[in-house]
Amino acid sequence: IGGDEAERGRTMIERVTIRRFKRFNEVTFDLPGHIVLAGPNNTGKTTMLQAVAAWDLSLTRWKQLNDYQRHGGSYAKAPIARQAFSAVPLRAFDLLWNERRYSGSIEIEIQSKKGWTVAMELIADSTEQVYVRPKPQADPQTVRQAQLSTVFVPPMTGLSTAEPVYQRSKVDQLLWQGKPGDIIRNLLVEAHQTAAWNVLKDSIQRLFHY
């Protein structure tokens, strides 16, 4: 989606910093605007997108605690089971950690163009569960206001001939299973209900004359 209208209505990411996540020990991506990630295989394009999706999932799950105060200098931890971790398909949580060193925490920090910066911790527990919470550097008001809606759609292997209407939890589950072709129509319906849909149509018309 491009254009100033889309930027006014949505949270735009300005910078992503990843620590101990999959192939990266520490790396920062500066995102100056609407971008396309391009490059050879195994250079981290998908990893960066998965990190953003993991940040969104972690913050959303943590906010369900409805506890925005620090306790002893840190925020409370919220558990996430492997089966509920829809951001990245996993057979065990140690696959998220750099070189599979499953200890300590992963940190994913997002800085938005709206001025807030929030780093989320993913804390090792077992192969079937992690804990998540914001880093304490972000004050409670910032954490409360921070919001980023993401959908990471992996490469498709084919479209289903029939597709029922799914609840959002089922959509997330099928994405986690690597089956975006089973829910692409649901994703389009969801996108159609937002103000950005007309901007997307205009962009497709301008770029592809379709």
Task: Please give the residue ranges for each predicted region.
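P-loop NTPase switch/coupling surface
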Residues: 1-173, 192-210
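Low-complexity, highly charged intrinsically disordered N-terminal segments
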Residues: 178-194
